[in-house]
Amino acid sequence: PAQPFRIKKRQGPFERP
């Protein structure tokens, strides 16, 4: 995927609101 950190909020140590 292009944004593996935007698929689910709070999915890791990078909580990005």
Curated annotation (Swiss-Prot):
Q: Name one GO molecular function term.
A: serine-type endopeptidase inhibitor activity
Keyword Disulfide bond, does the record have it? yes
The alphabetized UniProt keywords are: Antibiotic, Antimicrobial, Cleavage on pair of basic residues, Disulfide bond, Protein synthesis inhibitor
- What is one GO biological process annotated to this record? negative regulation of translation
Q: Which domain of life is it from?
A: Eukaryota
Q: Which family does it belong to?
A: Belongs to the 2S seed storage albumins family.
Q: How does it assemble?
A: The mature protein consists of a small and a large chain linked by disulfide bonds.
Protein purpose: Inhibits cell-free protein synthesis. Inhibits trypsin and chymotrypsin. Does not inhibit ribonuclease of protease activity. Has antibacterial activity against Gram-negative bacterium P.fluorescens, and the Gram-positive bacteria B.subtilis, B.cereus, B.megaterium and M.phlei. No antibacterial activity against the Gram-positive bacterium S.aureus or the Gram-negative bacteria E.coli, E.aerogenes, P.aeruginosa and P.vulgaris. Inhibits the proliferation of leukemia cells in vitro.
| Protein name, UniProt field | Napin-like polypeptide
Query: Which species does this protein come from?
Result: Brassica oleracea var. alboglabra (Chinese kale)
